[in-house]
Regions:
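Core, highly hydrophobic multi-pass alpha-helical transmembrane subunits of bioenergetic inner membranes
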Residues: 1-346
Length: 346
């Protein structure tokens, strides 16, 4: 793709995200979502591969339907209340339609089927954008309307997302699909707490974005898309493979790594809200995700590829690791000691 075109699409992506998260009017928020959608489509289909074109088409159809539902929800609310303010969403039908629309945009169960297919048809850098930046505007809308949404509906969607995100990722061999189901599972944790402590949802999203960026950039650096090729990477970049191992365990939520912090705080908040059963369900369902994270980590660092010589190292010099990957992997694994400070800030 032309560098100038890529720059224009990236700026449009940032502009659409900024418009949505900073607006109070429904039409402006909708316009920001549309700018985002139109900016990401060329980035998804830039390889001109049939899978990429198919992914872009699926993404466009899903996001167009979700955007239409957002507009319909805001118009229904304005019809009954005379308000276009995002925080004044009070009509029950509008709340229900908006929840459905945002679930479609995020890829929450039962509207999740498009996300793994789109991520599989995209490059790793575009997949990173789809998993992080593209989820920020819908989560911002959830944050702004959290006090009027239906807790029972959101809790049901969240537990189903955590269950299916873990369960459907078990038999995957494509790394992008595994990361897509990982994203669906993490969205379940973010969604269940949005009504009770919205700031905790944002903290969870920020930490998830950091860890996911570290994983995607590492995989992009070692040019790995399948589990079978992941098994041979540690001979080329042993230090990077070791950090990938720790980052994957952090994504799984194992202490004493960064990913344990949001899960710990969410379980604590759910217990305070007399939702101990939901907390137990999420904790048990996270074991499904732990299995495929361990599978990835095992392939990245422990298994040995078939070899016929005693020399495992390649003869050529490896490229230096990007400083951004080093910083992201460090943050993704070492934030837990300052968790008391972080928990008092939210």
């Amino acid at each position: 793709m032309n560098p100038q075109a890529k720059l224009i699409f990236t700026i449009s992506l940032l502009m659409g995200t900024t418009i949505t998260i900073s607006s109070n009017h429904w039409v402006m928020a909708w316009a920001g979502l549309e700018i985002n959608t139109l900016a990401i489509l060329p980035l998804i289909s830039k390889s001109h591969h049939p899978r990429a074109i198919e992914a872009a088409t699926k993404y466009f159809l899903t996001q167009a339907a979700a955007s239409a539902l957002v507009l319909f929800s805001s118009m229904t609310n304005a019809w009954y209340t005379g308000q276009w303010d995002i925080t004044q969403l009070t009509h029950p039908t509008s709340c229900l339609v908006l929840t459905t629309a945002i679930a479609m945009k995020l890829g929450l169960v039962p509207f999740h089927f498009w996300f793994p297919e789109v991520l599989q048809g995209s490059s790793l850098t575009t997949g990173l954008l789809l998993s992080t930046i593209m989820k920020l505007p819908p989560i911002a809308l959830l944050y702004m309307t959290s006090n009027t949404l239906n807790p029972t509906l959101l809790t049901s969607m969240a537990i189903l997302s955590a269950a299916l995100g873990g369960w459907m990722g078990l038999n995957q061999t494509q790394i992008r699909k595994i990361l897509a189901f990982s994203s669906i599972s993490h969205l379940g944790w973010m969604t269940i707490i949005i009504v009770y402590n919205p700031k905790l949802t944002l903290l969870n999203f920020y930490l998830y974005a950091l860890m996911t960026m570290a994983v995607f950039l590492t995989l992009n650096s070692i040019n790995t898309l399948k589990l079978s090729t992941l098994m041979t990477t540690w001979t080329k970049t042993p230090a990077l493979s070791a950090m990938l191992f720790l980052t994957l365990l952090s994504l799984a939520g194992l202490p004493p790594l960064t990913g344990f912090l949001p899960k710990w705080l969410i379980i604590q908040e759910l217990t305070k809200q007399n939702m101990a059963l939901a907390a137990v369900a999420l904790s048990i369902l996270s074991l499904l995700g732990l299995f495929f994270y361990l599978r990835l980590a095992y392939c990245a660092t422990i298994t040995l590829p078939p070899h016929t010589t005693n020399h495992m190292k390649l003869w050529h010099t490896n490229k230096p690791t990007s400083s951004s990957i080093s910083i992201l992997t460090t943050v993704s694994t070492t934030l837990l000691p300052i968790s008391p400070l972080i928990s008092t800030m939210i």
